[in-house]
Amino acid sequence: MQGNLTALLITSFIVLSVVLIGFIAGRNKSSRSSVEEWSVGGRRFGPLLVWLLVGADLYTAYTFLGLTSTAFAAGSIAFFAIPYTIIAFFVSYFYLPKLWEVSKKHKLTTLADYAKGRFDSKFLSLLIAIVGVLMLIPYIDLQLAGIQDTLTVAGTGYINIKVVVIISFLLVALYTFFSGIKGPAYTAVIKDILVWVIMLFLVVSIPIIHFGSWGSMIDKIVTDSPELLTIPTTGPKGIPWFLTASLVSGLALFMWAHAVTGVFTAKNADVLRKNAIYLPFYNIVLILVVFLGFAAYLVLPEGSDPRFALLNLIQVSYGGVVQGLAYSTIALASLIPCSIMAIGASNLFANNIYRDFINPNVKPEKLTMITRSMVFVVIGLALIFGMLFPTALVSLQLLGVSGMVQIFPAIVFSLFWRNQTREATIIGLLVGLGVTFAVYSTGKTFGIYEGFWGLSANVIALIVLNPLFVKKAKDKTNPIMDQLFTK
């Protein structure tokens, strides 16, 4: 399908304008004066900015394109995104404020930093850092795929898609290197305003354009495609998969390096409590986006590629101006999360791999420069990986969720369980990762989400083995444990 020049020009103008704002956000040299300033903004962000930043971080182009694609191809299974985010925000209310207080006092910028201090274990820190970096690469690639798909629909016949994608991500790498977290934080304001305005406009107008009203669209779904509105009771993605995927994804959400980067920018713990209450409002958009997938199923020709369901639906529904606004929204929902993900991955590598194992005596100024420079390496690796293995991205990201949730017991349990031991935690993490990869490799999930098997094995190993090492742990203390457990 031929692109639309007007839509392409509007998309390009908005994206380049936002990138420019990203550079302007870092004009003050203090934004890159230290790792803490560059990666978490000196922990000075208030409730609204954290809400917008975490929203920009978690609700990506993959969220919107992936949800409509899943709804288009598999129906109501796409609704699993709703309970999983609610689980994530509900649980986070109880542990993120405590984690933030520890990170603030001890100047921690990654979960691996916390694990090292809590358990006095560089090895556990290394494990968490490696898992965090490796799992983020395909996630960054999915953002690349999001903007590539957007440009394919908007710009076919006018531009070289791959060249423009590479240029776009290099620009993001540059403004991230220059501005740190302040770049995506301030550009997230624009992105989130566009998401709310454009997505709400789409979900209101598309049913009217094609069916006359929302009620008529629902009637047509019920009459012509009732299977879209039900979840299978059995099979590889039935109700057991839906429930376990929601639980695992919810627990994993704030284990991602980019998610916790947004969390650590908060100026106090109360900001995080407020965000746990108000972030679920984003689910209003998600629910409606799923119905756009249903609309695409009814409107687009049979045999259409589910991957392009939302983009093609926009293309057949509107003229160039609205297309451009919609495409730019999706493009920004790719680029801004990519920036935050690159910060998270760079931070893990520089602090928990380079500083702890390669150059322990590195000076703070050099460490800051290495952390910032790693942005180019991370985004470069993501670009290469995405071009070499384009069909593996979604499955690897889903595996990434199952991998990241294995960190949950090491981080969250240890905030409340004083006698949790280093040895049992490490063994549990390794067992969880091993079981997850074994289930994923064999494909024998028995209708359960892969990560659930791994997390179950992880927790069982931790609980069973912890008593073997607990005697030494009872007599042990360190500054983080003193803060957590001394009344």
In which residue ranges do the predicted regions lie?
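Membrane-embedded helix-loop-helix hairpins and adjacent transmembrane boundary segments
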Residues: 1-487
